[in-house]
Amino acid sequence: MAQLVKAAQAGFDEKNDALVTVEPIASGIEIEITSKVIRQYGDQIKSVILNTVKEAGYDGVKVIVQDKNAWDYTIKARVLGALERGSKA
């Protein structure tokens, strides 16, 4: 399992992007999403985040996403970038 050792961010708070913050927690994966399209796409956004964190082999992560209508691949890239920045080298 990969280990998150510090809080980190990736992305931008701009149109068609997402600002992703990851923070270490004791265990599990927590997801917090802020988005104008949460009613329509909230489940899909959450699924992309959860699958990305699991596929990368992390546990004990809180993911906070401020979505500005980002595509799935953008969200995935931002989550992976934040995880890498906050990981043990």
Each predicted region: which residue ranges?
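N-terminal intrinsically disordered, cationic/polar leader segments
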Residues: M1-A89
